[in-house]
């Protein structure tokens, strides 16, 4: 597999411009909110960012299909033939966007035969883009700054905290998640944050583990998963009968999330970096 066709600067520019479109609407006094068939909210920002990202990707990479939260996606008979595909969540954390707490992201992931091989995640309210292309390391870049800074894999010399920082969703803290956290052992500090920011905190070594034992869609995780995998971790499937003590992303029978399945719903997973 050759990923040299990917232009990281162009992709960073796309996600940064989408973030700016979102912020223009975010800073208005008010904006329209619709309710989709699945009861989730949809704003003008979701629509504008999605349209911009899809148009830009189609212009630069016309042969790569797009799977997006805000598009009518092809049925599986056609999708199953995709070699490469973009998975896009133009505004992850729409509820956070509406509540104006700043905890929302833009997500562009690329898969190859179901495996995430590139990911770009922007946090509009901080201006930071995290990104990775398989085999090229993981990076972060501040808006209006020219260069990206490499995120060092943790390895043997990585920062080790006395407390294990565990992340949880603001709106999906269920009994199974509470039970899982209680079995981790040691000194645990629980933090709540919205959207794929949780996964980027793990990538940036600001947290250790994120158990997601509630529904998510493939476009919610693909970009972040690609970044975590480049750091030696990832989103691995959670099996209740196995008590995982905060590891993951390594060997030993760990099964990672796969993408472009017939059903685009993710199983429960644990995100971490060894």
Task: Enumerate the language-model features and the residues they cover.
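Residue-level signal for inorganic ion chemistry
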Residues: 18, 22, 46, 57, ...
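Oxyanion/phosphate-interacting regions
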Residues: 1-13, 19, 179-184, 199-274
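N-terminal subdomain of lithium-sensitive/metallo-dependent phosphomonoesterases centered on the IMPase/IPPase/PAP
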Residues: 1-91, 179-183, 243-252
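Glycine-rich active-site/cofactor-binding loop and its immediate structural neighborhood
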Residues: 82-125
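Acidic beta-strand-loop-alpha-helix segment within the catalytic core
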Residues: 108-200, 246-274
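Conserved beta-strand termini and adjacent loop/short-helix elements that scaffold enzyme active sites
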Residues: 36, 69, 169, 193, ...
């Amino acid at each position: 597999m050759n990923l040299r066709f990917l232009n990281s600067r162009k992709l960073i520019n796309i996600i940064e411009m989408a973030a700016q479109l979102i912020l223009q609407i975010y800073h208005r006094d008010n904006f329209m909110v619709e309710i989709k068939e699945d009861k989730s909210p949809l704003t003008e920002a979701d629509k504008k960012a999605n349209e911009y990202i899809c148009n830009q990707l189609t212009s630069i990479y016309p042969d790569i299909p797009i799977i997006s939260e805000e598009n009518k996606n092809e049925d599986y008979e056609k999708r199953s033939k995709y070699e490469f595909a973009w998975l896009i969540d133009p505004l992850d954390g729409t509820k956070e966007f509406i509540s104006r707490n700043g905890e929302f992201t833009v997500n562009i992931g690329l898969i190859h035969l179901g495996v995430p091989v590139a990911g770009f995640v922007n946090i509009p309210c901080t201006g930071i883009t995290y990104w990775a292309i398989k085999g090229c390391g993981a990076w972060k870049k501040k808006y209006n700054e020219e260069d990206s800074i490499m995120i060092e894999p943790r390895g043997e010399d990585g920062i080790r905290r006395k407390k294990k920082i565990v992340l949880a969703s603001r709106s999906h803290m269920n009994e199974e998640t509470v039970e899982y956290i209680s079995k981790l052992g040691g000194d645990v500090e629980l933090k709540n944050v919205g959207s794929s920011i949780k996964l980027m905190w793990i990538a940036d070594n600001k947290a250790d583990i994120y158990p997601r034992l509630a529904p998510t869609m493939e476009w919610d995780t693909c970009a972040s998963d690609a970044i975590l995998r480049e750091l030696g971790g990832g989103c691995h499937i959670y099996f209740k009968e196995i008590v995982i003590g905060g590891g993951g992303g390594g060997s030993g029978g760990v099964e990672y999330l796969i993408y472009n399945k017939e059903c685009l719903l993710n199983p429960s997973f644990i995100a971490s970096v060894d």
